[in-house]
Amino acid sequence: MGSVMMKIRVMPSDVDVDLNEVLEKIKNIQMEGVEIRDSAIQPIAFGLKAIVLMAVMPDMEGIGDRYIEEIGKIEGVESVEIEDMELL
């Protein structure tokens, strides 16, 4: 079994959401085998910013969906989407 790297975009529910706090909560999510390799806060438009993560996880059915679901439960998160995924 290999690993996959996912590029994940996390959009806040409002421009006033503290993205550093949201990012810390994301980093505190405990899922076996999931490792955040890189993270950044990127400007989108009109003062809106998003968190972009590079996460590595086992190539197992459903683990990416469960991780996305956990991120979506964080207060201040509007949406979570996978922008890119590749096998390692």
Swiss-Prot record:
UniProt entry tagged with the keyword Protein transport: no
Protein's organism: Archaeoglobus fulgidus (strain ATCC 49558 / DSM 4304 / JCM 9628 / NBRC 100126 / VC-16)
Name under which the protein is recorded: Elongation factor 1-beta
Function: Promotes the exchange of GDP for GTP in EF-1-alpha/GDP, thus allowing the regeneration of EF-1-alpha/GTP that could then be used to form the ternary complex EF-1-alpha/GTP/AAtRNA.
UniProt keyword terms in alphabetical order: Elongation factor, Protein biosynthesis
Family: Belongs to the EF-1-beta/EF-1-delta family.
Cited InterPro entries: eEF-1beta-like_sf, EF1B_bsu/dsu_GNE, Transl_elong_EF1B/ribsomal_bS6, Transl_elong_EF1B_B_arc
One example GO MF annotation: translation elongation factor activity
